[in-house]
Each structure stands twice: as C-alpha cells, then as structure tokens.
C-alpha cells in the first residue's frame, strides 16, 4: 500500500528532498511509526512530498508530478495555513476565500478524477498565540470551506483544529505543541502523527 503525504512545511518538516521516502521530522514520521505498529505485517510504501511554504495554488501546480504520476493508494493533504499566513507581512500575497476554495476544490477534483486514491483531508490549524490573532480570525473563515470540501471529496476528514482545541483543555499550554502556533515541535508532531494513524486505521484495514 502506497501512502503519500502532501502539504506545506508542517508535512515537509526538514525532509531530504533527494529522497522522497525520507519522512522528515514532523507528523509523517510519527504517523508512519504508529501505522507500522498497528499493521506490523502489512507492506507499506510511504512517500513525503510536502514543500515548505506551499499554498493551495502551488500544490495544484505540482499535483501532476507530485501525486498523479505516483498513483498512491492513499493521499493525505494538509494545506491552507500559508494561504492565510501570506496575507500578512512584507511580501504578502492575497488569497481570497473564494480563490482558496477554487484552488482546493481543483486539487481534490483532479485527484478524484485522475487517481484511484483514497483522500484524507486534514484541516489546517493555528494554536493560540497573541501575535497571530488576526491570522486566526482569517483561518476561521477558511475552516468551513475545508470541511465542506472534505464532505464532497474526502474519504477521511481530520478536524485537526478541533482536535487541538480539545487537547488544550487538558494540556493548556500551546507551547507544549508548537513554538509559534503553526509548526509543531516534537510533541506536536507526535500528537498529529498519532491522531492521523487513529483516523486512517479503518481506511487502511479496509484496503489491505
């Protein structure tokens, strides 16, 4: 079974770009460990092609080379925070909510039409950080779009924003999971990886 991780820096996480079997040091690494533990006798091929800084339009532009030609059995997509993040700062790029929806829909539609992959959509998230409150407000308008598209196209939806909100009720320090509210540290990456493995377990089981 071939499982492809796609997305931005949260997926990239320092992976070796010369070796797409290198999982990097983020959630894919921990997801792979958890999946192998759940299915010790299964034959898996894990590929990580996340690229740091990517927005939805950039992922669409490389979708043929970095997904369709690979023909994964399962593809996971965690994308969107940069579409919001890049609205701010000196080199800001304005992606409207309408453009975001069109880009993300185009990604999912093309995957559905040109692969047989099961699609896992992971919601973007932003942990509470005072310096990022405007970004968080913008993210609130993006998340319903992701949920809507996941209902239309995804086989599994992981509401990571909601999952983190629940987790922070028992571990109320966002810094435990991330130093900047976006990029997970080792604790955050392990948490996301284990959440991922739990959510895709039934999907994997039914496709072995």
Q: Residue locations for each model-derived region?
A:
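Short glycine-enriched, charge-decorated loop/helix-capping segments at active-site entrances
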Residues: 17-22, 90-97, 134-137, 178-179
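Surface-exposed cleft-lining segments at the edges of enzyme active sites
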Residues: 49-51, 55, 84-99, 129-134
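Charged, glycine-enriched surface loops/patches
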Residues: 95-122, 143-155
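Catalytic His-Asp segment of secreted/periplasmic serine-dependent ester chemistry enzymes
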Residues: 125-208
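Proline-aspartate-enriched helix->loop->beta-strand connector
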Residues: 67, 71-77, 81
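Structural recognition of the beta-strand scaffold that forms the well-ordered cores
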Residues: 3-5, 45-48, 74-78, 119-123, ...
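Serine-esterase "nucleophile elbow" of acetyl-processing enzymes
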Residues: 1-52, 57, 62-71
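Active-site segments of SGNH/GDSL-like serine hydrolases
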Residues: 78, 82, 108-143
């Amino acid at each position: 079974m071939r499982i492809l991780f796609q997305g931005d820096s949260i997926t990239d996480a320092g992976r070796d770009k010369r070796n797409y079997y290198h999982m990097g040091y983020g959630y894919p690494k921990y997801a792979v460990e958890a999946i192998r533990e759940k299915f010790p006798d299964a034959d898996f091929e894990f590929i990580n092609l996340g690229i740091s800084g990517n927005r939805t339009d950039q992922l669409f532009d490389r979708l043929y080379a970095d997904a369709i030609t690979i023909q994964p059995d399962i593809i996971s997509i965690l994308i969107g925070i940069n579409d919001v993040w890049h609205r701010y700062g000196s080199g800001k790029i304005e992606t409207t909510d309408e453009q975001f929806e069109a880009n993300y829909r185009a990604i999912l539609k093309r995957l559905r039409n040109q692969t047989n992959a099961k699609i896992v959509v992971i919601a973007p998230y932003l942990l509470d950080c005072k310096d990022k409150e405007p970004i968080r407000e913008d993210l609130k308008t993006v998340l319903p779009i992701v949920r809507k598209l996941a209902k239309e196209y995804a086989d599994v939806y992981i509401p990571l924003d909601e999952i983190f909100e629940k987790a922070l009720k028992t571990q109320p320090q966002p810094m435990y999971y991330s130093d900047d509210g976006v990029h997970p540290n080792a604790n955050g990456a392990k948490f996301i990886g284990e959440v991922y493995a739990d959510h895709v377990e039934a999907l994997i089981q039914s496709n072995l």
